[in-house]
Regions:
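N-terminal pre-catalytic segment of deacetylase/amide-hydrolase enzymes
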Residues: 2-83, 89-103, 261-289
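Active-site beta->alpha N-cap acidic-glycine motif
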Residues: 53-136, 140-145, 151, 155-162
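Divalent metal-coordination and catalytic microenvironments
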Residues: 86, 101, 134, 174-177, ...
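Active-site beta-loop-alpha junctions enriched in small/polar residues
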Residues: 88, 113-115, 139, 177-179, ...
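Structural detector of well-ordered beta-strand residues that form the stable sheet scaffold
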Residues: 109-111, 135, 175, 197, ...
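His/Asp/Glu-enriched short active-site or ligand-binding loop at hydrolase and phosphoryl-transfer sites
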Residues: 180, 186-224, 272-283
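Histidine/acidic-residue-rich catalytic or RNA/ligand-binding cores of hydrolases
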Residues: 208-212, 238-246, 288
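Catalytic grooves of carbohydrate-active enzymes
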Residues: 223-278
Length: 289
């Protein structure tokens, strides 16, 4: 994941879903080959906007397009939200995120870079042992926009294999770097057995921001069925880890981390249960043909 502005568009009366053609316009013709289920686009990041043709069906269920899913959020009125972290594992950030989650009792999905998982296998195992879920965030966080099918598949396959080797479990989810979901990525994800996980709410304030601003944003805009996209790493492997971009991203991550305990506490005070992506989707959105 790359930092993107979170949408604060009010929830529509029903959840928006993509028709076959609408998904093809947004993600490419690979969806016809691989199939997928898309749902929950009533609130979404600008980076993940797609051309919508259909409004939600009254029941708010997913639309069946095959055996694989593309998820932004889940249409529900139940106070359940998926918490996700990208770009790790990181020896400075990941343990502190795990501590905050343990204190709050929240569960999360960690979308890891294979490059980082191979270098910090103990952290991958710690995430699994703490009861959290693993996702595949590619091998080196390469932006997949404009990449060939073979380049794309290599990024997904190497990431998956390194994460599975370190954690001992196969990651269910694939989250594309920067939210750039291409036709080749949809194909590769389906071939590797992944569902695709995007996000509907990001950390909020532009720039580095402050812990108070991030916590205030999250506690204000998060609602039932959202997928929150945060970070426990900086995308290392794609740029100079000591360069200005890395320093800027680490400063942002430290602000997110400082905001996390307050944000979790406020969300739980609203009665919101924070769970993994699989817990959210499997409990609330059965596949419908």
């Amino acid at each position: 994941m790359d930092d993107q502005p979170a949408s604060s568009t009010p929830r529509a009366g029903g959840a928006a879903v993509l028709s076959r053609r609408g998904f093809l316009l947004g993600a490419g013709a690979a969806s016809l080959v691989t199939g997928g289920v898309t749902f929950g686009l009533d609130r979404r990041s600008d980076a993940q906007s797609r051309d919508l043709e259909d409004s939600a069906d009254p029941g708010g269920w997913s639309r069946g397009l095959g055996q694989h899913r593309v998820v932004w959020s889940v249409p529900t009125t139940l106070p359940v939200v998926a918490l996700t972290f990208d770009d790790g594992p990181d020896p400075e950030l990941t343990p502190r995120v795990l501590d905050a989650l343990a204190t709050s009792g929240a569960r999360a999905t960690f979308n890891m870079m294979g490059w980082n998982a191979a270098r910090h296998p103990g952290l991958v195992r710690a995430v699994v042992d703490a009861g959290h879920e693993l996702g595949n965030h590619t091998w080196t966080h390469l932006d997949l926009a404009g990449r060939s099918a073979s380049q794309t598949r290599r990024q997904l396959d190497l990431g998956r294999r390194m994460i599975e080797a370190a954690g001992g479990v196969r990651p269910r989810w694939f989250r594309p770097p920067r939210g750039n979901l291409t036709g080749a990525a949809v194909c590769a994800a389906a071939e590797l057995g992944h569902d695709v996980l995007l996000w509907s709410i990001a950390r909020g304030p532009a720039g580095v921001g402050t812990p108070a601003a991030v916590a205030n944003h999250l506690s204000r805009v998060v609602g039932p069925g959202d997928v929150i996209g945060l970070h426990d790493g900086i995308g290392r492997g794609t740029f100079d880890a000591d360069g200005s971009l890395a320093r800027h991203l680490r400063a942002r991550r430290l602000v997110e981390l400082a905001a996390l305990p307050t944000a979790l506490r406020r969300l739980q005070a609203r009665g919101i249960r924070l769970v993994t992506a699989s817990e959210l989707v499997d409990a609330l959105v059965p596949i419908r043909a």
